[in-house]
Amino acid sequence: MLFSCRSKAKLLALTLLLLSAATWLYLSVGETEYGQSLGPVAPRFSATPSFQMELEIRLREAKEENRRLRQQLGEVRNEEQSTGGGTEGDNSSHCEHRSLTEKCELIHVAIVCAGHNSSRDVVTLVKSILFHRRNPLHLHLITDDVALRVLGNLFNTWMVPSLQISFYNASELKPDVAWIPNKHYSGIYGLLKLTLTKALPSDLSKVIVLDTDITFATDIAELWAIFKKFTGEQVLGLVENQSDWYLGNLWKNHKPWPALGRGFNTGVILLLLDKLRLIGWEEMWRLTAERELMNMLSTSLADQDIFNAVIKSSPTLVYQLPCYWNVQLSDHTRSEQCYSELADLKVIHWNSPHKLRVKNKHVELFRTLYLTFLEYDGSLLRRELIGCPSEGEQQGGSQATLSQLDEEDPCYDFRRESVASHRVHLSFLPHLTPPPDPYDVTLVAQLSMDRLQMLELICRHWEGPMSLALYLSDAEAQQFLRYAQASEVLQSRTNIGYHVVYKEGQLYPVNLLRNVALKNSHTPYVFLSDIDFLPMYGLYEYLRKSIAQQDPAGSPRALIVPAFETLRYRLSFPKSKADLLSMLDTGALYTFRYHVWEKGHAPTDYAKWRTATTPYRVEWAPDFEPYVVVRRDCPEYDQRFLGFGWNKVSHIMELDAQEYELVVLPNAFIVHMPHAPSFDISKFRSSENYRLCVQALKEEFHQDLSRRYGSAALKYLTAERNR
């Protein structure tokens, strides 16, 4: 009777242990016969030459037997690796050797990703792969326009070493599958995996194909190594389906597509692309689909139905992967038969429409594993840990800039963080692009987690489009997602773009956040506000009318919206300018920062505004920092200014240098709501070095302004010296 690989391994290991113990006992007894133990510090009596020779011979024999048993144990493990995969009853990964993949072999992974939600899901999948991987990766992403914009920017700012990204336009592949009726919730994108032999480069010979709802619990190189086990006509590596779907017994009159036994799940696929092309894969799946659709009328599980119909007709095409490479958490799963302990898990597949809410007796364990990567700091994955050459395109210029900085500089933190690369996830939640309108305006602002409560309030005051940059950690981003999905107010809005900038460093990158929100607005005009301000009711329509009254051929204008503030957390918000003036007179409202930074808004000329009925022009003055409406193509904010101090002042100065007219709107206002001091303003007030660094950055900004605008910028230097 032949032993299984596991039995052989256990027997040899036990034999090796017993032999070692016997050798030790023999030597101990031999020494004890001469009245001496083998203690390392005790003096030894001289043994007779014949006994010593016999002892050495037996010791050499024991060592040789030990070596031989170790060699046999290794051979059993190698034999196990070459024969253990792909058997239906193999539910444990203990006997599987680690990857045979070469250390720096490039692993190719293909993923179909479309829309805002799928773009979020794929990030968690990629994190789990990157966390475990030890090889360079090349991701092939088949995307729609939304996912291309979101993921293209995310990976460009993520800058992970030894990671290449290629994008493929899903629109060019849709005609190949659009004729197939599909009832699956993934829609037409759930069929695109059928087209990968056409979509991917012709010189790419093999690829791992993954759904976006996959989580890896091991090194993907182990899965890649299984390609070497393919033999004969095998071109597809798949795990058996772990529900009774294809057996047709889930409910009365259930008629599934044809499948081999339980069928196979296509959440994880190994594709031998070169062989698939040789056997005419495109024609094969198309003819099979046409034949089956005559009876089935539509697919229920998208591409999976067609893959299974092909395998039913040609079973030699499939290599059955061990089930732990796709532990399926569907509504009718039997996946618990696939693992006995955590070490058995390789890949978790959340293939139920209910996702994390699926019913499974071990779902808490799986959910914890998933949440680990969902909230994992993606910046940590930038570190080069695999010892393979990185692709040049993933190395940002910021690294070269950082290496040139002087770490002894008292302002080193400011300079380092001003050039740091932050991961940016655009359009974190679904939203619609506003229809073209020459007078439309987007409210632009930035915030951190502690200002999240302002979102619903602003939504009640501003009905127009918004572009908001949120500075969050990976974990906070998920808290924001849950908050937004639970808010009826936010869910009712489809014209708000939320753009997550992930935390990096200690200083708040306020101007980077403003630039992200500014560049990702989609209207001709923007209202550059801050999150702590509530717009007056009707401000959106008033600004549109004010923009329409401008002379399009005239000089560029910055329309100033006067700012006020209240110290009361509960405020009866003014419904008109008359109400606001009354509240000013009673002390319920004040002009913004009149008591701590009066010159920041004094040039607005509040006395004139009280009685103004038409827009009026004002002149620039030092430290002026109003909130303005400008064209979207205005100058960006200077990102050297971080935290507190001069971040808006520098922007208004540049608008003036570009000869923008500063015009105050007579019937517009915003009100600043009270909040606790930010961390950065506290540091500005308490740290002399912080203030000195802000001053140094101001001087450098003045010099740069002079270089760009020449003599026109002299007045700013003069004003600075006369302060």
From Swiss-Prot:
UniProt region (Xylosyltransferase activity), positions on chain: 107-382
Matching InterPro entries: Glyco_trans_8, Nucleotide-diphossugar_trans, Xyl/GlcA_transferase
Chain intervals for the UniProt region annotation (Glucuronyltransferase activity): 383-723
Ranges per topology, Cytoplasmic: 1-10
Enzyme class: transferase
Record's subcellular location: Golgi apparatus membrane
TM stretches of this protein: 11-31
Topology, Lumenal side: 32-723
Cofactor comment: Binds 2 Mn(2+) ions per subunit. The xylosyltransferase part binds one Mn(2+) and the beta-1,3-glucuronyltransferase part binds one Mn(2+).
Reported cofactor(s): Mn(2+)
Protein name: Xylosyl- and glucuronyltransferase LARGE2s
